[in-house]
Every structure is written in structure tokens, then in C-alpha cells.
């Protein structure tokens, strides 16, 4: 049985509230879970300590048993110092795409053409 540490949504419409739970990976998002290990309230201010509540002892024991946190939960655990999130490296992210390069080349040609006409 593959275990995940993930969020289950609660709350009302347009007022989300998430529980951080241990659940089987095949279970539905808001379905059956094994243990509740925390809560996340995105409606609270970012600097509010009650925005993310974690039970550190339970989380550490479940991580030791092999439970895998989802990406969002891993961010919370990394901020709390319970787990290390690997850094991602995408050197091509800052590069413009092919179409943007083509547009820039056309703009450069158009800018160079009037300058040549003025010099002649």
C-alpha cells in the first residue's frame, strides 16, 4: 500500500480549508484517510502561525514508515524543517521561445533598415 501525505479539501464554497492527512495513494482526494497530521487554512494571512498547523511527531513517524508527501505538502514540511525539498534547475526558463526570437530578429531588421536609408 503506497501512502501519501496530502491535502483533503474541506470548507464551504469559495472558502477552502485543507486537512493534511495520511492516505492510500489510490483513495479519492476527499475520501478515506488513515491519520490526520495537520491543517492548512489558505484564507488566513501568510504570516499567521495558525495558517499551517503540523503535528511534527506524527509526520516524522509516517515519513519513517515510507509515506511520500505531495509537492504542496513537501513545501510545508520544508518550511517547518521536517523534510528537505530538492531544488529544481531549469536553465532554459529565462530564454525566450522560438517565436519571440523570430519577432526580435524582425524588429532588429526593421530598425536597421531606416537607419541605412537615413545614412544614404
From Swiss-Prot:
GO biological process: translation
InterPro entries cross-referenced by the UniProt entry: Ribosomal_bS16, Ribosomal_bS16_CS, Ribosomal_bS16_dom_sf
Any one Pfam family match given in the protein's UniProt record, by short name: Ribosomal_S16
Record-linked SUPFAM superfamilies: Ribosomal protein S16
Tree of life domain: Bacteria
Segments of this protein annotated with the region Disordered: 81-120
Biased composition annotated in UniProt, kind: Basic and acidic residues: 95-110
Gene3D superfamilies in alphabetical order: 3.30.1320.10
An annotated Gene Ontology molecular function: structural constituent of ribosome
Family, similarity comment: Belongs to the bacterial ribosomal protein bS16 family.
Name of protein: Small ribosomal subunit protein bS16
Origin species: Methylorubrum extorquens (strain PA1)
Amino acid at each position: 500500500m503506497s501512502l501519501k501525505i496530502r491535502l483533503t479539501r474541506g470548507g464551504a464554497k469559495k472558502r477552502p480549508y485543507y486537512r493534511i492527512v495520511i492516505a492510500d495513494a489510490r483513495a479519492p482526494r476527499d475520501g478515506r484517510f488513515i491519520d490526520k497530521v495537520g491543517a492548512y487554512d489558505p484564507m488566513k494571512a501568510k504570516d499567521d502561525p495558525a495558517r499551517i498547523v503540523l503535528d511534527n511527531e506524527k509526520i516524522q513517524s509516517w515519513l519513517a514508515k515510507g509515506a511520500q508527501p505531495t509537492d504542496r505538502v513537501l513545501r510545508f514540511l520544508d518550511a517547518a524543517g521536517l523534510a528537505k525539498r530538492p531544488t529544481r534547475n531549469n536553465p532554459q526558463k529565462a530564454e525566450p521561445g522560438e517565436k519571440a526570437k523570430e519577432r526580435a530578429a524582425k524588429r532588429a531588421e526593421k530598425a536597421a533598415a531606416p537607419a541605412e536609408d537615413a545614412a544614404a
